[in-house]
Amino acid sequence: MNAVDPCHSPPVAPTASHSAGQPDASLARRELCREDLARGSLRDAYLKSDLADLAWSDARLQHSLDHTLGTARGRRKQAGNNTFTGSADIWIFAYGSLIWNPIFPIAEKRVARIYGLHRSFCLWSRLGRGTRENPGLVLGLDDGGACSGLALRMDAAHQAEELLLLWRREMVTGAYTPTWVKARTAQGAVDAIAFVMNQHSHAYAGRLPEAQIVENIRQAAGINGRCSEYLAQTSAGLATHGIADAGLKRLAALCGCGA
């Protein structure tokens, strides 16, 4: 977990001073924190905006979580391995903000690489890093290529509470599909949950021209801060762990937020 919790006040809810039910991005410049997730403030921000119909309930989140864990049990059973009972540690593959703001307690961290998916600014952000009128872009895993990031181990003792909070964060509108991936590390491969872009989501941006990506990242801001800050933090987080991403580094330079 980060040494300094970025939580000082709840995400800003919409007020009468801005248009179309959108939160005023100028009122908040801080990252999401655990307290926001524990008290449901992120979902509340959606419910108080004109994006309310997109917010998932805890029941729907729990169903998605149960399905994801059930998929893991099924895979192990087919392989003749019945050791996954819900009491095993779980790995999460981090490729964006989970690298520099994981929020949940991390028992172990490894540099990891997955294949068949790549890091892409393919997810519109109309609340956290932008607005409906001026949407930001954040990262998703899209089809093809490979991606280096971090495998983060969550120990079994924390899973009952922390996995639901993780789902409240990543699956607040169902923009991702939680997917088990093979994360290859120097210490061996591990099965990890990755939040892969849901290409059927309202928020899927697809493959955009670089110029448009740069424009949106440079201009957009939302309740969790500027989109350019998200890019800068991700670029710095990767560099801290010795992970090279030439495409991300180029975007950071073009957006004026490179190291």
Tell me what each language-model feature is.
Residues N2-A259:
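A glycine-rich, hydrophobic/aromatic-adjacent loop/helix-cap motif
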